[in-house]
């Protein structure tokens, strides 16, 4: 694996790979890697000649400065994990290289910026869209890989690719979970052992809702209440939102008519750490 910090150097290196007709798969990350990230690297390497990954903590997508300052940085261990997983090129620019001046532009995502994560993290998806657009322009991959845990981010990026005609296939990879069911996340590092045990109930609540819908055939409203009632047992969990939505648009639904695939999406705080998760349900 080679590590590159310069945009110009990366472009020169990738130009040579493409001259050889090598396919390029890309995995963007912010570091603090876990098994979820590693699964993306392995899939990208399996499906492409060259696997490129990036580590860049993007300041534009943090609407809470404290959250940005607390984001875990562990460059040496991240580089080791990347190399062992099969990454060929690791791009690690600093902020001055990536944003010589802070961008003045914002990207209006439309409806996706007004619901779920968009409603609770103003400006977040504009920041995501800018950093991903820049990375796509710099790297020009054939495929890019993202985790399904960030289901709304995947939807935003698919919209970005479609509307701006990026010739890139977006691959959404399955959520990787701990044995307890807790979705793998870099933020989990900030939880105590007890906090992790409590946070596992977030996924259990999603499973309760799935059972209510698929086995007990309850209404959308009743299924949602069942999930909230389950979480109400745990005073350590503060739910920000728990929504049942159409899986394609992520718009909230009130009934199952005409729906073939729905998603249950949640954001909650445990020990002051904001966690998100989702469960897609085939009807």
Curated annotation (Swiss-Prot):
InterPro entries with a match to the protein in the record: Cyt_trans-like, Pantoate_ligase, Pantoate_ligase_C, Rossmann-like_a/b/a_fold
Catalyzed reactions: (R)-pantoate + beta-alanine + ATP = (R)-pantothenate + AMP + diphosphate + H(+)
Family, similarity comment: Belongs to the pantothenate synthetase family.
The protein's name: Pantothenate synthetase
Subcellular location(s) of the protein: Cytoplasm
Lineage summary: Bacteria, Pseudomonadati, Bacteroidota, Cytophagia, Cytophagales
A biological-process GO annotation: pantothenate biosynthetic process
UniProt binding sites for beta-alanine: 61
This protein's pathway: Cofactor biosynthesis; (R)-pantothenate biosynthesis; (R)-pantothenate from (R)-pantoate and beta-alanine: step 1/1
PANTHER family referenced in this protein's UniProt entry, alphabetically: CYTIDYLATE KINASE/PANTOATE-BETA-ALANINE LIGASE, PANTOATE--BETA-ALANINE LIGASE
HAMAP family, sorted: PanC
Single GO MF annotation: pantoate-beta-alanine ligase activity
Top-level taxonomic group: Bacteria
Key word Protease present: no
